[in-house]
Regions:
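N-terminal active-site segment of His-dependent metallophosphoesterases
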Residues: 1-65, 157
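Active-site environment of divalent metal-dependent phosphoester hydrolases
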Residues: 11-14, 51-54, 84-100, 115-119, ...
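Binuclear metal-dependent hydrolase catalytic cores centered on His/Asp/Glu-rich metal-binding motifs
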Residues: 13-34, 65-66, 123-171, 188, ...
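Active-site neighborhood of phospho(di)ester-bond hydrolases with catalytic His/Asp-centered motifs
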Residues: 4-6, 43-48, 78-86, 110-114, ...
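A short C-terminal boundary segment appended to hydrolase-like catalytic domains
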Residues: 241-335
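Conserved beta-sheet core of the metallophosphoesterase superfamily
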Residues: 78-80, 184-241
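Active-site-proximal segments of metal-dependent phosphoesterases and phosphodiesterases across multiple
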Residues: 53-74, 166-197
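Acidic/His-rich segments in extracytoplasmic proteins that coordinate ligands and/or metal ions
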Residues: 59-109
């Protein structure tokens, strides 16, 4: 079975520098321990941090969203990672290149870089083609080394290059953060990709679960939400694993995940109605004016930030003094 999850951050972040996910991994924790993985399954996830020994940042900011390769050596990695997202360039070109080299040296497949936009593998007797790109602007460089903001014609050409595959998957970093339904342009692009030959479209970036639709008999999951990520806001804790089983009468299915206080995922059976993906599916083609859509985006962002500030205050005693000063200084600069 193919198992697909959403956003994965192996590192410490902004509000937990020195005691976040990365620090737990350094101490020997495995973030995937709750996924009940089988050797016969093929796992895919979005690598939304940097794995390198180098950074073009300084002080505290050189360690946020970055972890050293040696610290990941004890983790049983997923089989394939997407490396096209808005955090992989956070520490510069050399860091991104080092991360790709680390994955290759450890025989871990990756997709979404400019030189490796797609991959083809065999699973359950089928040839699977998968491609990845990002539809989000990059905040750290004007020339990202991953496949960024492609034109429709370029997307079509890459899909057509997978024509000999039995099954084609698109893994897309897109949309707006912290909202539970897609923007209308995403729906348009998703339909276009299905018409070009994609059999399954998987989205991520909003950091919360969004709905799905079936278009021309093909599944489109607009956002899987987080898999491993240091976010305390409750809507960012619910996620799914998408299952693709060519030996089952039900080709595509899903299971729910919950992100615990250690920011690691575990399977759950029951989920609040507001996060139920069948409910969220009813919102996919929600007709709403641009102004109202983005008003909801910014309202949710304010709620997310409020939770972060409260958590920051609660954890002041966990910060190293120099990290605390750097974070406060950066916060004041941004204001």
């Amino acid at each position: 079975m193919i198992k697909i999850v959403g956003d994965i951050n192996f590192s410490d972040g902004y509000f937990d520098a020195g005691f976040g996910v990365g620090s737990s991994i350094v101490q020997g924790a495995d973030p995937f321990v709750g996924l009940k993985r089988k050797d016969s399954d093929y796992w895919i996830g979005n690598f939304e941090c940097v794995c390198s020994n180098v950074s073009d940042k300084k002080a505290t900011f050189a360690n946020q969203f970055r972890i050293s390769p040696i610290c990941l050596s004890k983790i049983k990695h997923l089989d394939l990672y997407g490396v096209a997202n808005n955090h992989v360039m956070q520490h510069g070109n050399d860091a991104y290149k080092e991360m790709l080299a680390y994955l290759e040296e450890n025989h871990i497949s990756h997709i979404g870089s400019k030189r490796q936009k797609k991959s083809v593998f065999t699973h359950q007797g089928k040839q699977i083609g998968i491609l990845a790109f990002s539809q989000r602007p990059d905040n750290f460089t004007n020339d990202p080394l991953y496949w960024s903001l492609p034109e429709y014609s370029e997307i079509k050409n890459e899909i057509e290059s997978l024509a000999d595959c039995n099954y084609r998957i698109a893994y897309v970093h897109w949309g707006n953060e912290f909202i539970d339904f897609p923007y209308k342009d995403q729906v348009q692009l998703a339909h276009y990709m299905i018409e070009c030959g994609i059999d399954l479209l998987i989205g991520m970036h909003p950091h919360r679960l969004q709905g799905y639709e079936i278009y021309k008999g093909k599944y489109i999951f607009y956002s899987l939400g987080n898999c491993v990520f240091n976010m305390k806001w409750e809507p960012t804790r619910y996620s799914i694993v998408v299952n693709v089983d060519f030996n089952s009468d039900q080709l595509v299915s899903y299971d729910y995940l919950y992100i615990g206080d250690n920011f690691f995922p575990r399977y759950i059976d029951n989920i609040p109605d507001e996060y139920d993906i069948e409910h969220l599916a009813t919102l996919v083609n929600h007709s709403i004016e641009n102004e109202k859509y983005y008003a909801e985006v910014f309202c949710n962002l304010k709620q997310y930030r409020k939770v972060n500030r409260v958590d920051f205050i609660k954890n002041v005693h966990n910060f190293k003094f120099k990290d605390f000063l750097n974070i406060i200084s950066e916060f004041l600069r941004r204001k």
